[in-house]
Structures are given as C-alpha cells and as structure tokens.
Swiss-Prot record:
Organism taxonomic ancestry: Eukaryota, Viridiplantae, Streptophyta, Embryophyta, Tracheophyta
Pathway noted in the entry: Glycan biosynthesis; starch biosynthesis
Family statement: Belongs to the glycosyl hydrolase 13 family.
Function: Involved in the trimming of pre-amylopectin chains. Accelerates the crystallization of nascent amylopectin molecules during starch synthesis. ISA1 and ISA2 work exclusively together as a multimeric holoenzyme. ISA1-ISA2 removes preferentially branches that are very close to other branches.
Keywords: Carbohydrate metabolism, Chloroplast, Plastid, Starch biosynthesis, Transit peptide
Pfam families per the UniProt record, alphabetical: Alpha-amylase, CBM_48, ISOA1-3_C
GO terms, molecular function: isoamylase activity
GO BP annotations listed: amylopectin biosynthetic process; starch biosynthetic process; starch catabolic process
Gene Ontology CC annotations of this record: chloroplast; isoamylase complex
Protein name: Isoamylase 2, chloroplastic
Localization (cell): Plastid, Chloroplast
Transit peptide, UniProt annotation: 1-70
Gene symbol of the encoding locus: ISA2
Superkingdom in the source lineage: Eukaryota
Effect of inactivating the gene: Strong reduction of the starch level in leaves, but 50-fold increase of water-soluble polysaccharides. No alteration of the amylase-to-amylopectin ratio.
Organism whose genome encodes this protein: Arabidopsis thaliana (Mouse-ear cress)
Length: 882
C-alpha cells in the first residue's frame, strides 16, 4: 500500500490526517513478473500472475491474476480473476461485504477480508454494459482518508503517479469469467483503520474523459478498512459478540459529518486517530455507527459533529468541539478536564445476595442528604479519601438507623458541572467522580455499589434525585444535535436556556435508558424527578395533560418496582412550580403545599382548613386514585432556609420562605426567644411525623445546622458531626427517633395506604366547638382519631399481628397564649396518657411510656389540659383494667 503520513507534504486541508503519531509509509517499488501490462495513472505497470493469498479454503475467491506494487511494509495489488468459481467464505468473521447501486442501476459489491495481517479489497461491478469499441473500459478513481472525507491522504510510491492535488489514483477494472468487472487492492493491516473512497468512471473512445458514476445517493462509494460499519443498536459503546471489538453507536440527526475520535493516551487532549464516519456505510437513519477491533490500544473516545448549518468552508471539522457520548457508562477526564468515554467495561461487582428492602410507600421514612456534605467535615473522623464520598455515607449508616430512617434520598449524583452544582448535570449514565475515594469514575462506581449494598443490608432503600429537564451549559448534549435534544427554535421562553425537550422521542429514549441503567447496574430503589413540571412540556413547549415520557416511565416494566416521585422545584428559577401532575397511580409527589401550609400555621398566618388537610394526607391532591402515602411531606429542603433558620430569620428578603424569627432576627442570647424557637422546631417535627404521608427530613436539621439566613443552595454547610453531641442535637435526634417509633407502632393511623374515615375523626376548637376553618384569627385545632374496629382494620389492610389500636388526641396551639383543652370523655377502664407536649423541658417533653393525665377534681369526669403557647400535644388512650 502506498503511504501517507504527517511527515509527507499533504496540503493545507489536512492538518493531522486524524493521527498524532507518525505512521510512515515507505516508498513503493515496481514488482515485475510475467509481462502483461495495465495502466495505473500515467505509468505502465508490470504485473505477474500468481495465486492470491495462497490456498483460499476460507476465502471468497480461489485464484486471481493480479499486479503488485510492493514495498517493505505495504503494497497495492491489482488482481484479475482466472477462475469462474467463487465460494462463500467459511470464516465470515474475517469477511465484510457491502453492496451499492449506481444511479444507472449497476450493482457494485465490495468485499473486505483480513488475512495474514493484510486487508484485501475486491470490487465487483455487474449489470453494466460497456460500449463495443476497444477503448471502452471502467476505471475506479480512489483515495484514502481518515479524519476528513473531503481530503484524501497522499500516497507515496515508486514508479507510479498520483494526482498531486486530489491525491486520487485511477485503476482499471478487468472482466472476470462471470461477465462481471472486478479489481482488487491489498493494504498492510498495520496502516488501518482508514476509509477507501472511490467513484467509477466509464471511459470510451467517444468520451476519453469518462462519464462519472456515483451511488444512487449521488455520493462516492466509501468502504471502511480495519473496522466495520458496526450496528446502530444499542446506542453508546458495546462490545462485539466475542468481545473482540467495540461497537460505537451515536445519535445525531442534524449532523452532516460525525467524526469518531480515538485516544491512545489518557494524558493528552489530542486524539490519536480520527475517523470521519461515512453517511452511507456508517449511518442508519439518524444513528451513526462503527465497529473497531479492540486489539488497538485506544483508551478514550469522543465525537466531533458538524451540523447542516455549517458548510465545509464555514468551519473545519477539527474546529468542532469533541463531545462526550451521551450513553457512555464509563467516562474519564483528559488533561484539560474534558470528559470522554472510556474504552473499558464497568468492573464486575459481587452483589452477593443483595435484595431491595422493597418498603411500601406508606412505611417510608426518608432522609435527604448530599453525598459530599454528609461526611466532608473533619468532624466525621473519616479518612480523607473516604470523607465526602459514597463510602462515607456507608460508614455513617448507624446515624441513619438512629433516626429511624429506612430510605435515603441522595441529591443529584450524576456527573455535573462543578461550577453550577449537582442540579446541572452533563451526563446521565455515570456518578460524579468526586464521590469516589480516589476521585475517579471507577472508584465512584464501585463505592456507590458498596454503599447501596450496605444500606440494603440495613433495610434502607436508596432513592436518587434526578434532573432530566435541563443540562449544564457546556460539556453536556450541546453540539450533538441541539434541535433534537433542546428546544432550539421551538419555544421562546425555553430557547435561551438549557432545557431538554423531554417529550421528544430521542430524549425520551435517553431518559428511559438512564433510569433502567441505574436500576439494573446500581440497584437503585427509586427516583425523585427535580423540576418535574417541565416534564409536562410538549415538543414545542406547550403544556400536555398526558406527557409521553411521564406515562412511559409509569409503565416501563424494568421500573415497575421503583418509587417515582415528582418534585416541581425548579433549580433554574430557584422556586417550586405547582401543577396538576398526571400519575397513573404510580407517581408520588413532593408536597409543596404541605410545606407552605404548615409553615403558615405555625407562624400564625394560616387557616385551620389548610392544616387539617395536610395532616390528613392532602386529600385535595391525592384522592384521585392514589392515597396519602403518595404525599412526600417536607418542612425544609436543601434550597431555602434550614429548619433552625426558619424560626430565626424572617427579613423582607425572605418573604417567600414563610418563616418567623420568633421575636428577634438572627442570633440572640434572649432566653425567651431561644425557648420559643426550640418549641417551634419541635412543633414542625411533630406535625411532620404525625401527618399521613411520607416524612422527608433534610440533612442537618436534626442538629441545627444554619446558613445564617441564606436561602441559597450554595450556602449550605457540611454536616458537623460534633453538633449531634450538643444539647440541641441530642434532644432533637432523640425526639425524631421517638416519633418514628410512634409512627411504626401506630401504623394503623400514621402509615396508611388509604385516607382516614371521616366517621373516625372528630375536630375541635379550643372550647370543644366546631373549628372556624377559614378564620385567620383561629390558631388552635385539635382532633380525636378513633380506633377502627377489627373489620375496619382488615379492610384498610393493616399489618397483621399489630397491637390493638387505641384512640388518639392531638392538639395544635399556634397562638401566643395558653389554651385549656378538654379531652374527650372515655368509658370506664380507659384513661388518657400524654406522649408528647412540645412545651415541656427536655427530658420529659416526649415519653415512650407516657404520663397518665387525670381530672383535677376527683369527682370531675372531664380532663382539662392546659396547652402552653406555641405547642403541640399527643395523647393516647390506655386500658387501666388489664
């Protein structure tokens, strides 16, 4: 084969020929044998008759006549078939066939065969009539290229000529005994991979310049050598059937050119090889694909995409940025911190007998945490390579157990922009590398699996916050196919932002494949979809009542056992957007109304009807075929004020936070203010854990972590483990643990799949009258929850073998004065016992055994209990005759 190399003069249109190392082709020399003559360019070449590649027991042809331009390393061979016999290749793995049609209807077949470190290319043309004159002949005008199909690489050989401007060579076909035209070329395998590109020229005495013949698509014929066309599915990187090759598959509808960039060194930014994929051979529909032998020492890969909007004169192919494969499951950084796909498989992991805890929705007790912030602080006392990683979370499982947690909700862990934070991902199939002990993706993948396995063994599920509605501004899907992935030119309010067009088919597929991957590869138990309201946008930005993606997720068979939660908080606007979310009885929701109404009540601004609705499971949202368990109830979250700041800051700039500083802004030494704040924190937690639905506790709220009144996400501080030993941390942690145990013990009330029956609830104002539901001045509410009969418990699917339920009485006083509460009368042999009074000192404001309350006067039948200002109480009946 004639040589091409950066060391040879190659013209301005080829900067590096797709290679960074020097692959030098030495000059060729003429090989003489039996003196038959054939025209190659302007030179008369001598060729010899001999058998092609020896005994072709496994070849498509058995004998040939050929001419050869030989060299010490490479050669070009021209062959003429001597026999009419052709057999199918026995070893199909080494033979690749391609078929084309010309616009005139002629059939062009090409076979590429690898044998003995050489590539043989046979080109056959049939259904073509040559004119009768003796000068009529068919010529193949060909060249080779790698990184740029518009620029052939120069061939350097002796005693033959090549067009010095186009670097093309002309070779004449010979007629075989099967009445078809044929020619053959041979290349040294060491110089692959590359493309052989050619067109045909029909020359006759009447037309010595020749009539050009292209494919029926008006393109040159293009054949990959040293690699194959590959397969369009699955998208991303996959291994061949015998693990002997890598298949690359990449979607881009708008690109006119896609270049596969391969790196043989992870410490360089320059690809070792670039292959400009042919739109005829390497494209099926909108998917570009190729298969490369894995014996090459390539370690990373990426793509360059050139869209229709640019002509070849506008932007050079090498000027396009190299983009990451959206479906790559193993990624790594280059020297410039650019992320590229890795040519390696995910390391095997021994899951052993790992099984998801598969906890019913109504039984969940969720703890939301940031992987880095949870153990990053030196107070975690973890090694530096473990702190702030998945491994760090696994090391602190005992704290989660202490709180009664049975599910962790991890803030986004997909690879994200370090400048903008975890809510701006650039990739959907890999965890962020900083969460691995060695800050590498490989360690992040392994340590995450270890974490999931550890949490599962402790009965704790793993839920992921995921962001599929927008991406980081750079390094994500930008530059691949913006008109398909984004709202490019479709929705004015979304066009300038990095909003993904989620209900566009190709984006739907990406999201579904990502979710399936995290479930199958990492054993994730569920997903919380951030900015879920944007999932309801159509392909032109319109609101959909039945969005295809949301429905597809709900009914996907691989996701059937996972928990699906919609969170309508928008990281771009830093605020929630309330919508009526379609659910198909599968989707739960992070309940923003719950947060707002509870905050309003405890700061004295809400109405009783709102509080009652939230306590009983938000029937205004979830009576549509779901139930209270589909309501994920939170008081604070990672954006906005932390729990301790909700009761400490309420400046004008924090109006949207619905907070109250309890009498003084910010830090204070006033005992009365501090006591009021402590009671309010207890009240928030009390209401959260006695409400029907799933309580979601935010990281750090159990120990009073503050951002000094900043609602910004970036103001969040790492978890300070020393605070757990403080007086505040001790009592609040114990209180949360107590409340989770109450929920478990009284699951018939607090962990229900269905709503409480109206006949089992009695509501009271402070004087045992009917509450004034819509009066903003009413700040006291109480309810009695009557135990269900045995038949009712069975009908409500209560857990078997649970202790018999007793009546409950719950009081809420958001006023600044005490309220005297008359507890409902009980039959003989029953009494009320107080389990919680948030106004009492610690220890004592909650009790497992409870404290029996009796009438002040022996002859008095009714029990009157004084509730202090800003307090909540919980009473339960006990049988005193047992």
């Amino acid at each position: 084969m004639a040589a091409w190399s950066p060391s040879v003069g190659i013209g301005s249109c080829c900067l590096n020929n797709g290679i960074t190392r020097t692959w030098k082709f030495p000059s060729a020399r003429l090989f003489t044998g039996r003196k038959n003559k054939i025209k190659l360019g302007s030179e008369t070449l001598m060729f010899t008759r001999k058998r092609f590649m020896g005994d072709l027991v496994t070849s498509a042809l058995q004998s040939y006549q050929f001419s050869k331009i030989c060299a010490s390393k490479t050669s070009i061979e021209l062959r003429e078939a001597l026999s009419s016999r052709r057999a199918e290749a026995d070893d199909l793995k080494k033979v690749t066939s391609y078929s084309f049609r010309t616009k005139a209807g002629a059939l062009v077949k090409v076979k590429v065969e690898k044998k003995r470190e050489k590539y043989s290319i046979l080109v056959y043309v049939s259904s073509l009539e040559l004119s009768g004159d003796d000068k009529s002949r068919l010529v193949m005008v060909w060249g080779v290229y790698r990184s740029d199909s518009s620029c052939f690489l120069p061939l350097d050989f002796e005693n033959s000529s090549q067009d010095s401007q186009t670097h093309t060579t002309e070779t004449t076909f010979v007629k075989s005994s099967l009445s078809e035209l044929m020619l053959g070329l041979e290349f040294d395998g060491k110089e692959s991979p590359f493309y052989l590109s050619f067109h045909l020229k029909l020359v006759s005495g009447r037309d010595p310049d020749g009539q050009e013949m292209l494919t029926h698509r008006d393109t040159d014929f293009c054949i990959p050598v040293g690699f194959t066309a590959g397969h369009p599915l699955p998208l991303g990187l996959s291994s061949g059937p015998d693990d002997d090759s890598w298949n690359f598959s990449f979607f881009s509808r708008s690109s006119t050119n896609v270049v596969l960039c391969l790196y043989d060194d992870s410490t360089t930014d320059k690809p070792a090889l670039e292959l400009d994929l042919d739109p005829y051979v390497n494209r099926t529909g909108d998917v570009w694909h190729a298969s490369v032998d894995n014996t090459w020492d390539f370690v990373r890969y990426g793509y360059r995409c050139k869209e229709t909007a640019h002509s070849k004169e506008d932007v050079d192919v090498e000027g396009e940025p190299i983009v990451l494969d959206p479906y790559a499951t193993v990624v790594g950084k280059s020297v410039s911190q650019k992320y590229l796909g890795s040519l390696s498989k995910s390391p095997s992991f021994d899951w052993g007998e790992d099984v998801s805890p598969n906890i019913p929705l109504e039984k969940l007790l969720v703890y939301r945490l940031n992987v880095k912030g949870f153990t990053q602080h030196r107070s975690s006392k973890l090694p530096s390579n473990v702190a702030g990683t998945f491994s760090g979370v696994a090391e602190k499982v005992s704290h989660l157990k202490t709180l009664g947690t049975n599910a962790v909700l991890l803030e986004p862990i997909f690879s994200f922009s370090e400048q903008k934070g975890p809510y701006f991902p650039f990739h959907f199939f890999s965890p962020m590398d900083i969460y691995g002990p060695s800050n590498s993706l490989e360690s992040a993948v392994n340590s995450m699996k270890v974490m999931v396995k550890k949490l599962h063994s402790e009965g704790i599920e793993v839920l992921l916050e995921v962001v599929f509605t927008h991406t980081a501004d750079s390094g994500a899907l930008r530059g691949i196919d913006d008109s398909s992935y984004y709202y490019k030119g479709r929705a004015n309010d979304l066009d300038s932002k990095s909003y993904l067009n989620c209900n566009y088919p190709v984006v739907q597929q990406l999201v579904l494949e990502s979710l399936r991957y995290w479930v199958t590869e990492f054993h994730v138990d569920g997903f919380c979809f951030i900015n879920a309201s944007s999932l309801l946008r159509g392909v032109h930005g319109e609101q959909l009542s039945r969005p295809p993606l949301v429905e597809a997720i709900a009914f996907d068979p691989l996701l059937a056992e996972t928990k699906l939660i919609a969170d309508c908080w928008d990281p771009l606007e830093m605020m929630p957007k309330e919508v009526r979310f379609p659910h198909w009885k599968r989707w739960a929701e992070l309940n923003t109304r719950y947060c707002r109404n509870v905050r309003n009540f405890l700061r004295g601004r809400g109405v009783l009807s709102d509080l009652a609705t939230r306590i009983c499971g938000s029937g205004d949202v979830f009576t549509d075929g779901r139930g209270p368990a589909f309501s994920f109830n939170y008081i604070s979250r990672n954006s906005g004020l932390s729990l301790v700041d909700i009761v400490s800051f309420s400046g004008p700039e924090l109006a949207s936070e619905l907070s109250w500083n309890c009498g003084e802004e910010g830090a204070t030494n006033k005992s009365a203010v501090l006591q009021r704040r402590l009671k309010q924190i207890r009240n928030f937690l009390f209401i959260q854990y006695i409400s029907l639905g799933v309580p979601v506790l935010n990281m750090g709220d159990e120990c009073g972590i503050s951002t000094r009144g900043s609602p910004l996400l970036e103001s969040r501080k790492p978890f300070d483990w020393n605070l757990l030993a403080s007086a505040f941390g001790t009592q609040i942690t114990q209180f949360i643990s107590f409340m989770t145990s109450v929920r478990a013990r009284r699951s018939d009330v607090f962990q229900r799949r269905d709503f409480l029956k109206p006949e089992n609830i009695v509501w009271y104002a402070n004087d045992q009258t009917t509450p004034k539901w819509e009066d903003p001045a009413s700040k006291f509410l109480a309810l009695e929850i009557k135990s269900e009969s045995e038949e009712e418990e069975t009908a409500s699917l209560a857990e078997p073998n649970e202790p018999k339920s007793n009546d409950l009485f719950i009081g809420f006083n958001a006023s600044d004065h005490p309220e005297s509460v008359v507890l409902p009368s009980l039959p003989d042999g029953s009494k009320w016992r107080r389990l919680v009074d948030t106004a009492l000192p610690f220890p004592g404001f909650f009790s497992v055994e409870g404290e029996t309350v009796v009438a002040e006067e022996p002859l008095q039948q009714l029990v009157v209990y004084e509730m202090k200002p800003y307090s909540c109480t919980l009473f339960e009946t006990i049988n005193t005759t047992a």
